[in-house]
Swiss-Prot record:
Residues 1-112 form the Response regulatory domain. This is Regulatory protein LuxO. The gene is luxO. GO terms for biological process: phosphorelay signal transduction system; regulation of DNA-templated transcription. Involved in the regulation of different processes depending on the cell density. Acts together with sigma-54 to repress, perhaps indirectly, some genes.
Length: 453
């Protein structure tokens, strides 16, 4: 890692620690070039602005002597033009600082995996860390398998899931595992761009196309040529622009705003929404023909409340680098906090968990996260269903006595129903871990199948 700011280098080291890689940090371009005489790295993370030379100078020197070493640029002074220039001169990717942990891990993990030809995480989706994701639950292993299966295809992928579940991380994982992984990944958030600017953001514009268009500008479609175009929150796109997008998908050609010339590109489409896309079609907010064009391989990201013990795995990973970043000493959670995390519904999903832990780490001190440190609403008592609603006591005859496992099964099923199908929440009320319920349900299903035979 070539980074002249020690605190930033330490932060990014903590982000990458879960990947289990050896990181050597230098502060100048000259030291970076000199270090190659002693050891050839699998990857170089390179700051664009250094005290003795530019990142572009370092890139040229490295590529001259070691052309196969992948380089990823990092800069707080990024622009689209700089990104394009860096990619043109051999940079594998381009990250804008401050860089989020998930984005950095996905990019670095993929670059190293491709450079060394080792596909440990892709070949073993049961690992706790997979392409930037954290978690080994059954629901996430199905996501990993879908990514592995779909990555090599050019077919469009439609990612659905609640806000905060990691849809952009998923899109980057698909791109990273694909044959286009060394080509650009360009993301555009359809909900964050004003209606009158989104066409220009997507297709670009020529000088004088509208007030303020002082120069020609490339759009996301052109920048993604050869790679992946990620359309986030696609269902927010205006119907008129959906028509132009459909034509672009069908033909691979588009016109810049203000231009009559057609441009042709080769991109792989990945899109995402936190809505039900078919419901949007039925209610007239999303074109049906566009839906069928894009909804080729559906991929649903489960909400955090359905990921069982992943909650605690993610929490520990976040706690590690947040404590390091903030200069704190937190290393563990109390059992009460673990139980509360497992029982909470997490309506904001992983993003909410990140914010909760950031709040705790910044405002408190110690080695253990305790219940009194939790911010609202996690510090409020759980709204437990009435026991009388779960099990109605009644007298029974000898003929009505059931095996103990069936009685336990009935109690657990009623608790799950009372919690609207939320197994982790039901587990919290029953004072057992979610994995215990999953294991029992699997065993009971096997017993019932044998009884049928």
């Amino acid at each position: 890692m070539v980074e002249d700011t020690a605190s930033v280098a330490a932060l990014y080291r903590s982000y990458l620690t879960p990947l289990g890689i050896d990181i050597n940090i230098v502060g100048t371009g000259r030291d970076a070039i000199e270090s190659l005489n002693h050891r050839i790295p699998d990857l170089i993370l390179l700051d664009l602005r250094l005290p003795d030379m530019t990142g572009m100078d370092v890139l040229h020197a490295v590529k001259k002597s070691h052309p196969d070493v992948p380089i990823i640029f990092m800069t707080a002074h990024g622009s689209i033009d700089t990104a394009v220039e860096a990619m043109r001169h051999g940079s594998q990717d381009f990250l804008i600082k401050p860089c989020e942990a998930d984005r950095l891990r996905v990019t670095v993990n993929n670059a190293i995996r491709k450079a060394t030809k080792l596909k440990n995480e892709a070949d073993n989706p049961g690992n706790q860390n997979y392409q930037g994701f954290i978690g080994s639950s059954q629901t996430m292993q199905q996501v990993y398998r879908t990514i592995d299966s779909a990555a090599s295809s050019k077919a469009s992928i439609f990612i659905t899931g609640e806000s905060g579940t990691g849809k952009e991380v998923c899109a980057e994982a698909i791109h990273a595992a694909s044959k286009r992984g060394d080509k650009p990944f360009i993301a555009i958030n359809c909900a964050a761009i004003p209606k009158d600017l989104i066409e220009s953001e997507l297709f670009g514009h020529v000088k004088g196309a509208f007030t303020g268009a002082a120069n020609d500008r490339q759009g996301a479609a052109e920048l993604a040529d050869g790679g992946t175009l990620f359309l986030d929150e696609l269902c927010e796109m205006d119907l008129d622009l959906q028509t132009k997008l459909l034509r672009f998908i069908q033909t691979g050609t588009f016109q810049k705003v203000g231009s009559s010339k057609m441009k042709s590109v080769d991109v792989r489409f990945v899109c995402a929404t936190n809505r039900d896309p078919w419901k949007e079609v039925q209610e007239g907010r999303f074109r049906e023909d566009l839906y069928y064009r894009l909804y080729v391989i559906p991929l649903h990201l489960p909400p955090l409340r359905e990921r069982g013990e992943d909650v605690i795995e993610i929490a520990y990973s976040l706690l590690g680098y947040m404590s390091h970043e903030e200069g704190k000493n937190f290393v563990r959670f109390s059992q009460e906090v673990i139980d509360r995390f497992n029982s909470y519904e997490w309506p904001g999903n992983v993003r909410q968990l990140q914010n909760v832990l950031r709040n705790i780490v910044v405002l408190n001190n110690g080695k253990e996260i305790t219940l009194d440190m939790l911010p609202p609403p996690l510090n409020q008592p759980l709204d437990r269903p009435s026991v009388s609603k779960l099990i109605e006591p009644k007298a029974m005859t000898v003929s009505e006595i059931m095996p103990l496992w069936m009685t336990e099964k009935m109690a657990i099923e009623q608790a799950i129903e009372a919690c609207d199908g939320n197994i982790p929440r039901a587990a919290g009320y029953l004072d057992v871990s979610p994995s215990t319920i999953y294991r029992k349900l699997q065993a009971w299903n096997g017993k019932e199948e044998r009884q049928k035979v």
